């Protein structure tokens, strides 16, 4: 009984071992098939590059000219067109100057102070012709001169720098002086005595900027008295006037009156020191 059980047990073990071996063999076979399939897949070209070698062979393949079916005139025309398609030859010009000419040019530079160079015959190297062409001699313009008269004239045209020791009078501050003149007071140019004269307390530099600042200050002062300007003008005038215009002047650095080209926007009419309305006509 025990022997039969042992025999059955050994048979089952052998069966299991055989099945295990068969499964291992089957697994090995499947792995081999899978690897072979993957090799075949990777041997295929990617992204449509299968025709690269074929395209290269087509590009590098020389094109044969069909001359058997063409006549003699056709052959001549094809040869001329092929020659026309060739790139044009580039000519290189080599300019050479003999040593004797170089020595002569240096001697003329040392003696006369001018540079004169001549260009003789120079060979022109081309693609199909080996002939030479003669170049006409050219003379360069003088670049420098050592003539003492020209150097002295050049020095004389250079302005001298300003001397720093002298004081600059134009930048000295001066008082701002305003003056009002009527049109009858300036018939012949620069007036001498204004109708209204006022010297302000402000000091300005004696230059264009200072004059502009003084002019602005005078305008500010006049605007303050603008509503009563007619009474001020007639009382200061002392006699009758008819359609007079008032102009603003300021004094410059030389104590002279300068017209600012500024005038009142109205006309003044005075009778016995009293202003009245000027008529439109007459």
UniProtKB/Swiss-Prot annotation:
Expressed in follicle cells during vitelline membrane formation. This is Follicle cell protein 3C-1. Residues 128-140 have a biased composition (Polar residues). The lineage of its organism: Eukaryota, Metazoa, Ecdysozoa, Arthropoda, Hexapoda. Changing residue 125 to T: In strain: Zim41. It comes from Drosophila melanogaster. Changing residue 82 to T: In strain: Zim39. Residues 103-156 are annotated as: Disordered. Residues 106-118, 141-156 have a biased composition (Low complexity). Changing residue 163 to K: In strain: Z50.
